[in-house]
């Protein structure tokens, strides 16, 4: 009886550990996949789609995944939908699965659930605390057709708050 309990406990630990390992990975799919062993990357082409452990969804035309660093770079008509429902359209996004950061140095358009549109030169999204941040030229067009310009902005998805600096309203 004692050995059965030990075996059951070991199986339980194994299953739990296996599920944790799966949760830490990105789930990536594409119509065309190629492995470049020299560079240590996997290349995805034609409708690349990926979900991270927080269920954030990102898609694009082309992607490269570096397994050792757990970094996915998507290029070409890239779209991000966060688990909270915010969307981002841009030309390139980097998903750092180890740090939990999704970012772009390209011009991007963010849309929140209330219909506000935020145009940024770059952004950084922390999936652990659901906060977007950006510095540079930022234009917010709210649902009431008001236009605001900022030089720095923070968007808290969970609390639905936008905090900006150097406001200019038009």
Put a short name on every predicted segment.
Residues 1-23:
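Gram-negative bacterial Sec-dependent N-terminal signal peptides
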Residues 19-170:
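N-terminal amphipathic/hydrophobic interface segments
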């Amino acid at each position: 009886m004692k050995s059965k309990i030990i075996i059951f406990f070991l199986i339980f630990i194994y299953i739990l550990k296996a599920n944790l390992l799966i949760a830490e990975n990105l789930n990536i799919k594409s119509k065309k996949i190629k492995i470049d062993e020299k560079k240590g990357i996997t290349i995805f082409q034609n409708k690349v789609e990926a979900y991270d452990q927080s269920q954030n969804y990102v898609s694009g035309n082309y992607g490269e995944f570096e397994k050792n660093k757990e970094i996915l770079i998507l290029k070409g008509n890239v779209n991000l939908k966060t688990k909270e429902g915010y969307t981002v359209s841009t030309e390139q996004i980097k998903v750092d699965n180890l740090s939990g950061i999704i970012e772009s140095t390209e011009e991007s358009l963010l849309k929140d659930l209330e219909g506000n549109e935020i145009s940024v030169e770059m952004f950084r999204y922390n999936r652990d605390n659901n906060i977007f941040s950006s510095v540079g030229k930022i234009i917010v067009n709210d649902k009431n057709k008001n236009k605001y310009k900022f030089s720095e902005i923070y968007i808290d998805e969970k609390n639905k708050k936008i905090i900006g600096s150097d406001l200019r309203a038009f």
